[in-house]
C-alpha cells in the first residue's frame, strides 16, 4: 500500500500542476507490479538506481534532484542527485527568491519560518551544483531543498564540504550525492510551522563506477576541523536515520563500501 500511496501522490501532483512545467520525471510501474516494486525502483537514473529508501513514503522527482519529504519536520530527509562537470559550468544567474515547492502536495515550509530566526536557509543540493541551466539552478531555491542552518556552519564547514564535493566530482568523473539533516531525536524548531533544526547533517558520495563511497556526519555547529575528521561509515548514518542507502547496489559491494571508514582513497 505504501507504493500505491506514492504513485497516488505523484499522479495527484500531475493532475494539479503540469509535470513538464515543474520538472517531475516519473516512471510508473505496471499496476500488477505495484506491490513488487519499492519507491526507489520507481525512478531510475541511467543504468543505476541510486535513490535511498524513504521513511516517509513520500518521494518527489525534479529535473535537478529528487527528495523524500518529511511533513512532520517540514523539510526533506534526503535530497539525491548526480553531479558532473557539466553541472558546474561558470554562470552568473540572478538568485531567485526562496519559495514553497509547488509539487509538494502537503506544502513545503513557508520561507517566512526562517525570518528573524537566526538561521540561514541552508541548501541541501547547493545552487552551485546546478549551474547547467537557469531552470535547474532556480529549483534549488524551493524550500523542499532547504534546512535551517547556523550561518557560521552554512558558510563554514558545510560550504567547505560542498566545495570538496565539486572537486571530487571533477576528479572522479562524476558522483552520486545524497544529503540531508538527521531528523531524529530532540530538535529545536523555528517558525509557526515548527521547522525542525537538525543536530547533525550528513552527506554521502559514491563514484559512478561504484568503486569508492564516503560518508560524512557533521555536527550542526561551527567548526574549523579538517573534513576527514567527519568521515564515518555509511552504516552509521543508516543507523541514525533509519534510511537504507544504495539498496540497488549488488549486496557484496554495498556491504563492503558501507562498512568502510577510510578516507585515504579520497584526495583531501
Predicted feature locations:
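Domain-level detector for secreted/extracellular nuclease and nuclease-toxin modules, and
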Residues: 17-268
Amino acid at each position: 500500500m505504501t507504493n500505491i500511496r506514492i504513485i497516488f501522490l505523484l499522479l495527484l501532483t500531475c493532475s494539479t500542476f503540469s509535470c513538464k512545467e515543474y520538472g517531475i520525471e516519473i516512471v510508473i510501474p505496471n499496476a500488477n507490479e505495484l506491490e513488487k516494486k519499492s519507491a526507489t525502483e520507481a525512478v531510475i537514473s541511467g543504468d543505476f538506481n541510486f535513490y535511498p529508501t524513504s521513511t516517509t513514503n513520500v518521494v518527489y522527482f525534479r529535473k535537478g534532484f529528487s527528495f523524500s519529504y518529511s511533513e512532520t519536520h517540514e523539510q526533506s530527509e534526503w535530497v539525491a542527485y548526480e553531479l558532473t562537470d557539466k553541472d558546474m559550468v561558470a554562470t552568473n544567474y540572478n538568485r531567485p527568491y526562496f519559495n514553497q515547492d509547488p509539487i509538494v502536495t502537503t506544502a513545503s515550509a513557508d520561507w517566512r519560518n526562517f525570518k528573524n530566526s537566526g538561521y540561514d536557509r541552508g541548501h541541501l543540493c547547493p545552487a552551485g551544483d546546478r549551474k547547467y541551466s537557469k531552470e535547474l539552478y532556480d529549483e534549488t531555491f524551493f524550500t523542499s531543498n532547504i534546512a535551517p542552518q547556523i550561518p557560521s556552519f552554512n558558510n563554514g564547514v558545510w560550504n567547505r564540504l560542498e566545495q570538496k564535493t565539486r572537486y571530487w566530482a571533477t576528479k572522479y568523473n562524476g558522483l552520486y550525492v545524497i544529503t540531508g539533516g538527521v531528523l531524529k531525536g530532540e530538535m529545536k524548531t523555528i517558525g509557526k510551522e515548527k521547522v525542525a533544526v537538525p543536530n547533525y547533517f550528513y552527506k554521502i558520495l559514491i563514484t559512478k563506477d561504484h568503486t569508492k563511497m564516503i560518508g560524512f556526519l557533521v555536527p550542526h555547529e561551527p567548526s574549523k576541523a579538517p573534513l576527514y575528521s567527519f568521515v564515518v561509515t555509511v552504516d552509521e548514518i543508516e543507523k541514525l536515520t533509519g534510511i537504507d542507502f544504495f539498496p540497488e547496489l549488488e549486496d557484496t559491494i554495498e556491504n563492503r563500501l558501507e562498512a568502510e571508514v577510510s578516507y585515504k582513497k579520497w584526495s583531501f
